[in-house]
Amino acid sequence: MQIGKIIKVSGPLVMAENMSEASIQDMCLVGDLGVIGEIIEMRQDVASIQVYEETSGIGPGEPVRSTGEALSVELGPGIISQMFDGIQRPLDTFMEVTQSNFLGRGVQLPALDHEKQWWFEATIEEGTEVSAGDIIGYVDETKIIQHKIMVPNGIKGTVQKIESGSFTIDDPICVIETEQGLKELTMMQKWPVRRGRPIKQKLNPDVPMITGQRVIDTFFPVTKGGAAAVPGPFGAGKTVVQHQIAKWSDVDLVVYVGCGERGNEMTDVVNEFPELIDPNTGESLMERTVLIANTSNMPVAAREASIYTGITIAEYFRDMGYDVAIMADSTSRWAEALREMSGRLEEMPGDEGYPAYLGSRLAEYYERSGRVIALGSDQREGSITAISAVSPSGGDISEPVTQNTLRVVKVFWGLDSSLAQKRHFPSINWIQSYSLYSTEVGRYMDQILQQDWSDMVTEGMRILQEEEQLNEIVRLVGIDSLSDNDRLTLEVAKSIREDYLQQNAFDDVDTFTSREKQFNMLKVILTFGKEARKALSLGAYFNEIMEGTVAVRERISRSKYIPEEELAKISSINEEIKETIQLIVSEGGMTDD
């Protein structure tokens, strides 16, 4: 173990001499307290160390010990339902050890419980040839997630001994004869967080991730293995969008990284998720969630590590063949941590003081998402969907973090403060936002629903865009200058906005909408527009149609509160629309109003 001496302390940056044998990315124990740090720069024998804990009270002359290991996470049974800090220390154990509600310094804790016994069920027999990524057995970690035990990277050989039984994560469960000799496998692996886990092949992401949020699933979908950004000013609803996706998306596992945001938001997750039921499995949402909490009052440097810790845990479960979603809230705070460390290292600043390598660091993170075939002989498919909030100051999306993010993600959900002020949530602006997965998702949904989903989505978006143009005319010369056809367009667009896009995250029914219900709701609104337009062409007046369809339009607006089990009620509105408008045409028609 290399032992150096501190020569300078500057906030989270510590410089130490006599470190010639240490390497970049080595973990260090800094000072007499032994706080955790990581070497980020070497100049001759002087190492610059970013410290993941508070450095007050540490001074020159104190020792620095290099461990010779990179910042790594422990991967094994016991990860799910846990809450970790940015360097994978379990917060509940931390509290028991320190007897404090705040993080103590210099406390070394294992990430996983090394004494708990897990029942291991072997799925292969002795004499089987195995290589990296092959599954040798499993542990039922929660009611939802079967934790598959894989052969670690770099090991290939014949199974000499394996048995089912109750083991800790440190007990040998399997012996493999390799070219280098006998290797004992345990249920735990370690993996450096800054290195992506290897895969066999990357696939095209073309299966939509159903989030239950109508504006996202219909107009701006994200696929399993895709990457999405949610930029928006303060109060626009970024965190609620992230929470909704974490709650209701049809993935197997969610990794939620609270990176530099308010502690109350993580508390909400901890309080809400155990009580909420996953519509896909019928079990508690906490049974499929991993939380990484790095709130705004925690050390800045640990924010930078928390994103990598989260994506490495996500990759581990992806390699088992699971679909994983990782939420980072927010990458702006992570970028601010990069900016602070860069400033203390006296590097040349880029735009707005961010380091010149901001774009490449963001790209490194997002490129670890994707739909893949994992290592192993059974062609397992898994995916990581990366969804990150971006908090541009003042809502200015031309700032560097947002711009560099938009270069690498394919979905942009732009939150609009003016919509939020009107209490239109989710406040995703349908004119600014986009998804480059729309074509693939449209094809997929047409096949699944056996219906013209993509045509309906195109028609709905055309109406919303037409409304934007008509609003310009209305602002200039007033609504009376519009033709009946144009006034009908405004009414249908209003119905799409208020009855379809607007969604109440705190209503038991409206919080989640299945794709079948979304299809039926959108079809009802477009059917009203189509039938009303037909009535106009037959001579009915706009005012006649609006007065005669008050009851049916009321039913359309209430359709979002119809439970999933009663979808036939929504379909029945289509017939009611046709009958009502036919009655208006037969009774009114060319009569003057």
Curated annotation (Swiss-Prot):
Gene3D superfamilies: 2.40.30.20, 2.40.50.100, Bovine Mitochondrial F1-atpase, Atp Synthase Beta Chain, Chain D, domain 3, P-loop containing nucleotide triphosphate hydrolases. CDD domains: ATP-synt_V_A-type_alpha_C, ATP-synt_V_A-type_alpha_N, V_A-ATPase_A. GO terms for biological process: proton motive force-driven plasma membrane ATP synthesis. ATP binds at G232, P233, F234, G235, A236, G237, K238, T239. GO terms for cellular component: proton-transporting ATP synthase complex. It is an enzyme of class 7 (translocase). Its EC number is 7.2.2.1. PROSITE patterns: ATPASE_ALPHA_BETA (PS00152). This is V-type sodium ATPase catalytic subunit A. Belongs to the ATPase alpha/beta chains family. Involved in ATP-driven sodium extrusion. It holds the Pfam family ATP-synt_ab. NCBIfam families: PRK04192.1 (NF003220). It catalyses: 4 Na(+)(in) + ATP + H2O = 4 Na(+)(out) + ADP + phosphate + H(+). It comes from the Bacteria. HAMAP family: ATP_synth_A_arch.
